[in-house]
Amino acid sequence: RSRGLGDVYKRQVQVDGGLRTGRDVIIGALLGADEFGFSTAPLIASGCIMMRKCHLNTCPVGIATQDPVLRKRFVGMPEHVVNFFFFIAEEVRFLMSKLGFKKFDEMIGEIDVLDKKKAINHWKAKGLDFSKLFFDPKMGESVPKYNCDKQQHPIKDILDRQLIQRSK
């Protein structure tokens, strides 16, 4: 099977920007991503109306402000964001079953499942070269196709942690 971008098994490949549906997550995984960054869609689920005033401290719905008067306008609830992600997960499960995958990890980097002709033949794709994106590196089955080795962070052995432990 093809490996897509997931051959970099010691690194995380993250998809970010414009993720709104479970289908977006599936496409990212098939291209090799093993992490997914959502930002705008959960903000909308919590009540954001996209006024693009976050940096001005004048958010009219009270999400991105420290002004007590504006903060009182916030009517969002954490449950709305949780429900959004439940719907995403449900759609991902549904599409995985349609594609014949039982585990999410099985899907990472399986670019052969994508219908590439529709993308390549689309009028907006005229003149674009997708060969590098859909390249099959012909790696053996012994080569992992997703991030299965976690990084070793030296932060667990820093002096601060030892001092905090001693202070208890």
Predicted regions and their residues:
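Single conserved hydrophobic/aromatic residue that forms the stacking wall/gate
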Residues: 1-9
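Generic secondary-structure signature for well-ordered alpha-helical cores
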Residues: 7, 34, 64, 68, ...
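Flexible glycine/proline-rich, aromatic-decorated loop/lid segments
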Residues: 3, 30-70
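Catalytic cores of alpha/beta
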Residues: 20-33
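Long, distal/terminal scaffolding or interaction modules
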Residues: 69-71, 82, 86, 96-99, ...
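Glycine-rich beta-to-alpha transition loops that act as phosphate-gripper elements at the mouths
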Residues: 10-23
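Terminal amphipathic helices with adjacent charged low-complexity linkers/tails
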Residues: 101-158
